[in-house]
Amino acid sequence: MFLLRLLYRSFTRQLRRRSLIALTVALCASICVAMLGIVLDVGDKLNAELTTYGSNIVVQPKADAVVSNLYETDRDAAPTAHLDESAIPKIKTIFWAYNIVDFAATLKGSVKVSSSGGEVDDLSVTGTWFNKDLSLPTGETTTAGVTTMRSWWTMEGSWPADDADQAVVGSNLAGRLGLSEGDTVTLTTPTGSRPLTVTGVYTSGDSDDDTLYAPLAVVQELTGHIGQVDQVEVKALTTPENDLSRKAAQNPAILSSADWETWYCTAYASSIAYQIEEAIPGAVAKQV
């Protein structure tokens, strides 16, 4: 009985002061939760907005990445090494596979481009996936391609099919050659020639306006690089960078076991890039 009376008095004595303390604690907790929600929401929205403007991770052959780092060459420089196209779907088997929004393999090649309106010699064109169905090592399937990674392009017409002799042409190149939707453009290399139907003319606002995009298989055949690619663009949903992710990006080996596990199991761009390198032999993945 005495114990119950003691407890009762401890709660009822100075009730006003205790109520004020409880109210203050509750208010502080509410403010902290609200601020945390705002911070996380802003980071997620910023990341989602940035991913609408193309890839945020680029995968290259290790040899090309080394040369690029040593001599600060442009990403558009002619490739000196290649990746196996059949290994690229492994990107969707990494720990953060569900954060991979889209990806596309590409292969650049120098070709002669001609049409009824003129011709251009030694033009660098890009072969890629547009909307390609892929079989994964897990037995699942996925669709990948640049159609969702070029959302800022203005397209007059439609995207090509991956299994057809078709292409989309940049607005500047289309103007030089007098091309429009439905016209035919011919790509020629020492390996042979390939007439392609123009399905659309796009405006990108950058150097892509001076070139064209064709199905990956077409450029592989014309350049003699069957089954090979020189770059993979990856669009991934990532967690905003912090000191841990920046430290890991320099060298994951310097992390402690606890930090390494935290970094690997968080969707930082650097950890996703690291996992892509684990999945694809001979590849280097970098955040862009």
Give each language-model segment a name.
Residues P190-P195, V201-V288:
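Mechanotransmission and gating elements of multispan inner-membrane complexes involved in transport
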Residues M1-A34, G43, A48:
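N-terminal Sec/SRP start-transfer signal
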Residues L4, S30, L36, P137-V146, ...:
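C-terminal or late-domain output modules
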Residues A105-G109, S116-N131, T138-E221, H225-Q228, ...:
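Hydrophobic secondary-structure segments that place a key small or acidic residue at a functional site
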Residues N69-L70, S135-E140, H225, D243-A248:
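Short, charged, solvent-exposed linker or helix-capping segments at domain edges/interfaces
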Residues L36-S124, Y274-V284:
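Hydrophobic, regular-secondary-structure patches
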